[in-house]
Amino acid sequence: MAKGLGKGINALFNQVDLSEETVEEIKIADLRPNPYQPRKHFDDEALAELKESVLQHGILQPLIVRKSLKGYDIVAGERRFRAAKLAGLDTVPAIVRELSEALMREIALLENLQREDLSPLEEAQAYDSLLKHLDLTQEQLAKRLGKSRPHIANHLRLLTLPENIQQLIAEGTLSMGHGRTLLGLKNKNKLEPLVQKVIAEQLNVRQLEQLIQQLNQNVPRETKKKEPVKDAVLKERESYLQNYFGTTVNIKRQKKKGKIEIEFFSNEDLDRILELLSERES
């Protein structure tokens, strides 16, 4: 299955014969969502807009479904299904396909990853599911999805956060940048109060990075030595490296030289960073 990752969905959407013989009108009451759907939240405003489009133009692209014991499972097109329900339709156009459980899972994940904007946490869960069920490495998955290896790795790291913090990211209360930065806190007992401080004071990612650096060094904010103000170029380079390595990076410039500090918090984290460095060299 892993060998053909990505090809199944292209064949399903791009090579389907949309003649009258292949498209059926299926009752909405007989349809149920794909159990492997990674998307947990559907934007109400976006669905309302899609509903208006359905009312004016109908459903332009048929759903892909699979026959089940109690009706049909939606393989692809759950947003169209939900919009059709909101529009009060009784039936929707659909193409029935015979698909295995494994292929259903793959298609559900790939459709969302390729066609819609998942939340960072939903995207991470989709990557995790593909890695586990298709027996792929992060590098293999990145190549087949056309993503970078750091992009996959940085999303997956969110899943190591406590569930309540993952939920805050899923809701949009915290950003992915906040989540990745929180992973750098050494004393995990300080994690919960720190999260509450971020929310209460609406700290941005950069402010959180500075606060975590102080906490990790166990230096009170009031007595911390004031560091030289960095120019815009250094800040830009620093931000780029932090995004690439998924951890705190500090660039220090002196008179005729400088140094780059990359933080890691375990042997596994160090191996991850070294792997990213070796990829840049190859």
Swiss-Prot record:
Stated name of the protein: Stage 0 sporulation protein J
Domain of life the protein comes from: Bacteria
Coiled coil: none
Function: Required for the initiation of sporulation and for normal chromosome segregation. Antagonizes sporulation inhibition by Soj. It probably interacts with a specific DNA site and other proteins involved in partitioning and cell division, and antagonizes Soj in response to cell cycle events related to chromosome partitioning.
UniProt keyword DNA-binding, yes or no: yes
Record carries keyword Cytoplasm: yes
Annotated GO MF terms: DNA binding
Segments of the chain annotated as binding DNA: 139-158
GO cellular component, one term: bacterial nucleoid
Family to which this protein belongs: Belongs to the ParB family.
Consequence of gene disruption: Increased number of chromosome origins, probably due to early DNA replication initiation. In a double soj-spo0J deletion DnaA transiently arrests for longer at its chromosomal binding sites, not just at oriC.
Signal peptide: none
Pfam families assigned: HTH_ParB, ParB_dimer, ParBc
Keywords on record: Chromosome partition, Cytoplasm, DNA-binding, Sporulation
Gene Ontology BP, a term: chromosome segregation
Cell compartment(s), UniProt: Cytoplasm, Nucleoid
InterPro entries from the UniProt entry: Chromosome_partition/occlusion, HTH_ParB/Spo0J, ParB/RepB/Spo0J, ParB/Sulfiredoxin_dom, ParB/Sulfiredoxin_sf, ParB_dimer_C
